[in-house]
Amino acid sequence: MAISRLAGAARAAAPVSPGVAVGGSISVVIPARDEADRISPLLEQIVGAPGVAEVIVVDDQSADTTAAIAVAAGASVIAGEPLPAGWAGKAWALQQGIEAASSEWIVTLDADARPDPRLATAVVARADRDDFDFLTVGGRFECPTPATRWLHASMLTTLVYRFGPPGSATTPDRTMANGQCMTLRRDRFLASGGMSIVAGEVVEDIALARRLANDGWSVGFLDAADLLTIRMFESLGDAWTGWGRSLALPGVEPTSRQVFDLAVVLVAQALPLPRLLLGRGDLLDVVLLANRLGTLVGTRTAYDRADAAYWLSPLADLGSVSAIARGITRRGRQTWRGRTYG
């Protein structure tokens, strides 16, 4: 199962590259809650970028200077309304921003995104060329410490083992997405309910992609590492807590499939190396380890640097398995930036 998903990398769709602008203007929507420490690099690159008619920052009731920074950078700022019952914060912020936008095309970006100024026109051109109704793209990760890179690379690999790389063909109920950069046509999206169809989802990007795919939309998830860098986490602890919270895809994957995928990751990704090191491995473990190392070679372009910490990331695989297991078994409410969900 895992090997067949990895083999899909050879058949994956081509990455997004800079494209000629298509007809119709582009609005960039950025949901932001207490992002004063990291939103400036994004705004420096995207305000005034080619093809971008407006940049809308939805200030989701921040307690810091997010709004002032956005105004100073030339963005339009919307003061987010109080969170309605049944909504998660990001989905609500995106809904407000998309409703306020005036362009045919919407590109959403998270505050931790570091885009090439050509990104917006590139993703819109690709969506238009390939007739995607909804397109998300993955970027290149910037991990500021070796420890963060070590764990993050292992966690990313669990997604490749479970779902294949960006651009892989898949079924609607296994569709993947990256909510850090989404592209869609405003009017059709709002006519279909907008973010309200995933209002209460914590993993709203994948839930949205799967809902739209099941409704007959053409949904794409492609690589755009040459045009987008993401700085998600500042430390190993941040990665463990932040990504560990959603790595099991709570609310998106049924428990039975979560457990099955966990078993695939454990057997095919995490166990072969320790089994061989302990002298208990066999030929199958050798084959699986070779696949693991091949995957490591394949994902190196997803990181801003591939140093010793990156190449040693298979040693973190058992930790990544435990993060998925913890996500499957976690019960109760979760807190994020002063809000409690669940």
Where are these regions (language model features)?
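Long helical/loop segments within the catalytic core of UDP-sugar-dependent glycosyltransferases
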Residues: 2, 6-9, 79-99, 122, ...
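Catalytic donor/gating beta->alpha subdomain of glycosyltransferases that bind UDP-sugars
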Residues: 127, 136, 140-159, 190, ...
